[in-house]
Regions:
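The alpha-helix within a helix-turn-helix
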Residues: 62
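Short capping segments at the starts of secondary-structure elements
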Residues: 53-57
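Helix-turn-helix DNA-binding motif, specifically the short coil turn and the N-cap/start of the second
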Residues: 68-71
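Charged, amphipathic alpha-helical coiled-coil/dimerization segments
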Residues: 27, 77-144
Length: 163
C-alpha cells in the first residue's frame, strides 16, 4: 500500500519549491520524449541554440546555460565525439573557439525541436494558452532578475573568511 502524501504545506508557499516540483515533472516529460534520442537537457539546449543562432563562441554558450567553463568543455567534448558539433578556433582570438553544428547535429536539432514543440502538451493540459504564456513570462522575469542581480551566498562570505 502506498503511503499517504507528505504534508508540504510549510513549503507550498515558496516559489522555489513550486518551480522545482514543476521542473522535476517537465524533466520527466523531456526524458520520456527526447530521451530515446540519447540527448541530455544541456545538449538539447546547445543544439537548439546553435540551430537558431549559427556558430557561437564556447564562452557564450557557457554563459547562456549558466554553466562553468570546464563543464561546458566536457559537454562539448561528448557532443563532438558523437559527431553533433565541431569546435573551430577563432581567427580573431586564438584563445576562443566557435561551436558549429555538423550536418548530423543539424538533423538532430531539427528532430529534437519537432518533438519538443508538442511534448509538453499533456503536462500543461490544465492550463489555457493565456496561462501558459503568463507562466513563461513570469518564469523569464524571475530568471532575468536573478541574472541581473546575482545574490551573494552566505557561503561566499564564509569561504572568504576561511581563506
Amino acid at each position: 500500500m502506498k503511503a499517504d502524501r507528505l504534508d508540504d504545506r510549510s513549503l507550498a508557499h515558496l516559489v522555489g519549491y513550486a518551480a522545482s516540483r514543476a521542473a522535476l515533472e517537465m524533466r520527466k516529460v523531456f526524458q520520456h520524449h527526447v530521451g530515446p534520442l540519447e540527448l541530455r537537457v544541456a545538449e538539447f539546449t546547445i543544439l537548439r541554440l546553435l540551430a537558431d543562432n549559427g556558430p557561437v563562441a564556447q564562452r557564450r554558450l557557457a554563459e547562456a546555460l549558466d554553466m562553468a567553463a570546464p563543464n561546458m568543455a566536457v559537454t562539448l567534448d561528448r557532443m563532438g565525439a558523437r559527431g553533433w558539433i565541431e569546435r573551430v578556433r577563432s581567427t580573431d582570438d586564438r584563445r576562443s573557439q566557435r561551436v558549429h553544428l555538423t550536418a548530423a547535429g543539424d538533423r538532430l536539432a531539427a528532430e529534437a525541436g519537432a518533438i519538443a514543440a508538442s511534448m509538453e502538451e499533456p503536462a500543461l493540459a490544465g492550463l489555457s494558452r493565456a496561462e501558459r504564456a503568463l507562466l513563461i513570462e513570469l518564469l523569464r522575469k524571475v530568471a532575468a532578475h536573478r541574472t541581473a542581480k546575482k545574490p551573494k551566498s552566505h557561503l561566499d562570505e564564509e569561504m572568504k573568511r576561511a581563506a
